């Protein structure tokens, strides 16, 4: 977690930089995160009693459900994993079991903690890596092996003295060369020189085929046990100094990190600040008034998810992980089903319900221009590499937004994702001709938008296939 936790208002402001509208959803996740901080300040007895209030987001596709959860996890440095509810199967059937979401969360947490620890020791690791690079670029003299014959031992006194002096001179030359190379490395003059480095060979896992209920974890455990018994193979690779430094820095950093301590911290972080985002939860809801064998299977998955959301202990290769204080955010479009179609026990575990609104024309205009990673900024940057300054007039932006809105209304509503298809269609010819275009500035006008998209957008049959 951050040293200075963000207030709910600050969290919403940060989210506004990337996501347009959806204030209710932003507030809900901001409060959930702030409550985690509040809980951490309580005494231990009360802290254990307070569980996170899980959130259920409802709204059409492409309005920002997943993006809100993903950005929130980045803001606070929390372990975050996004899973699809439809990927899981009931216990006893072939497929992923629901406990794998917790194992994925712990793996993410371990990766986060490991990165942080590596950044802490990066300076020392780089220093050690540079020393190793110097030794690789200027190897030491080879030590002479093999016993001397008896005559040499008796009569070769002067020769020994001469050899000793020659070796001293050679050592001094090597040391001077190493100082010179170290200086050149520091100045970055040797970045493109090649050097041969020994690196650990990545062996393909024989347990990749072990998938399904329980087998996945068993395969990982057996693989870990065998890898600790078998010596790690190394292979020689020819790399540039720049690439070799990265490899050696990682190796040196790994030596400086206590992995047992890192794993312990990662498990604790997953338990206390982990976020699991369950997408497409409406797809495992039983359809109203319908009944089939598929519905029975869906209900089975819900019943398997239930104990994890309620709070249970899951075994992972890093130890037992409790899910009591993991924050679960579920999301679904709920076109065909309603939240009430979920089993009652699961409904009760998502007390905070947030409905995300459909995007209006004004929302589309904001999405195109306002966020830090706005689509128009991306296209401008791409064409800038070809020496073209791409500009959009305000009326053209409005026209693009209107086309996106109307196509969503007339066909399937896919939210902001519609803008991707429309902009690709609009700029297709320009992107193709860009390397040969001599104009330095290209301005997109409403007339150009109408010319490229107008006829397609108005024809419902065409827009279904093209936009």
UniProtKB/Swiss-Prot annotation:
InterPro entries: AAA+_ATPase (IPR003593), ATP-dep_Clp_protease_ClpX (IPR050052), ATPase_AAA_core (IPR003959), Clp_ATPase_C (IPR019489), HslU (IPR004491), P-loop_NTPase (IPR027417). It is found in: Cytoplasm. GO terms for cellular component: HslUV protease complex. Transmembrane segments: none annotated. Residues 147-174 are annotated as: Disordered. ATP binds at residues 20, 62-67, 279, 345, 417. It comes from the Bacteria. GO terms for molecular function: ATP binding; ATP hydrolysis activity; peptidase activity; proteasome-activating activity. It holds the Pfam family AAA. Keywords: ATP-binding, Chaperone, Cytoplasm, Nucleotide-binding. PANTHER family: ATP-DEPENDENT CLP PROTEASE ATP-BINDING SUBUNIT CLPX-LIKE, MITOCHONDRIAL-RELATED, ATP-DEPENDENT PROTEASE ATPASE SUBUNIT HSLU. HAMAP family: HslU. This is ATP-dependent protease ATPase subunit ClpY.
């Amino acid at each position: 977690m951050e040293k200075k936790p963000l207030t709910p208002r600050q969290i919403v402001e940060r989210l506004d930089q990337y996501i347009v509208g959806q204030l209710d959803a932003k507030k809900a996740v901001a409060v959930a995160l702030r409550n985690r901080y509040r809980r951490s300040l309580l005494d231990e007895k009360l802290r254990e009693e307070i569980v996170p209030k899980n959130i259920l987001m409802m709204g059409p596709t492409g309005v920002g459900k997943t993006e809100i959860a993903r950005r929130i996890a980045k803001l606070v440095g929390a372990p975050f994993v996004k899973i699809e509810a439809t990927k899981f199967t009931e216990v006893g059937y072939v497929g992923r079991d629901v406990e794998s979401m917790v194992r994925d969360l712990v793996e993410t947490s371990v990766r986060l903690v490991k990165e942080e620890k590596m950044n802490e020791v990066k300076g020392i690791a780089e220093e050690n890596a540079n020393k190793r690079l110097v030794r690789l670029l200027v190897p030491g003299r080879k030590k002479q092996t093999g016993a001397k014959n008896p005559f040499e031992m008796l009569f070769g006194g002067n020769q020994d003295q001469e050899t000793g002096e020659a070796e001293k001179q050679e050592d001094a030359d090597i040391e001077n060369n190493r100082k010179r190379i170290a200086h050149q490395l520091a100045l970055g003059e040797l970045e493109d020189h090649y050097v041969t480095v020994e690196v650990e060979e990545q062996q393909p896992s024989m347990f990749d085929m072990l998938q399904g209920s329980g087998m996945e974890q068993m395969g990982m455990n057996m693989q870990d046990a065998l890898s600790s018994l078998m010596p790690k193979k190394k292979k020689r690779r020819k790399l540039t100094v720049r690439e070799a430094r990265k490899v050696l820095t990682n190796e040196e950093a790994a030596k400086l990190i206590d992995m047992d301590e890192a794993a312990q911290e990662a498990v604790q972080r997953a338990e206390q600040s982990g976020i699991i985002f369950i997408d497409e939860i409406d797809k495992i809801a039983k359809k109203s008034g319908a009944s089939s064998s598929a519905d029975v299977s869906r209900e089975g998955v819900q019943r398997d998810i239930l104990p994890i959301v309620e709070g249970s202990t899951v075994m992972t290769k890093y130890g037992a992980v409790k899910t009591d204080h993991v924050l679960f955010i579920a999301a679904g479009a709920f076109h065909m089903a309603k939240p009430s179609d979920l089993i009652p026990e699961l409904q009760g575990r998502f007390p905070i319900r947030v409905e995300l609104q459909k995007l209006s024309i004004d929302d589309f205009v904001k999405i195109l221009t306002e966020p830090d990673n706005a689509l128009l900024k991306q296209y401008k940057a791409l064409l800038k590499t070809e020496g073209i300054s791409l500009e959009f007039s305000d009326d053209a932006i409005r026209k693009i937004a209107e086309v996106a809105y109307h196509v969503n209304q007339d066909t399937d509503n896919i939210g902001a994702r519609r803008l991707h298809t429309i902009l690709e269609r609009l700029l297709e010819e320009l992107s193709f001709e860009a390397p040969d275009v001599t104009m330095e500035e290209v301005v997109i006008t409403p007339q150009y938008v109408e010319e490229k998209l107008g006829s397609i957008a108005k024809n419902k049959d065409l827009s279904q296939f093209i936009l």
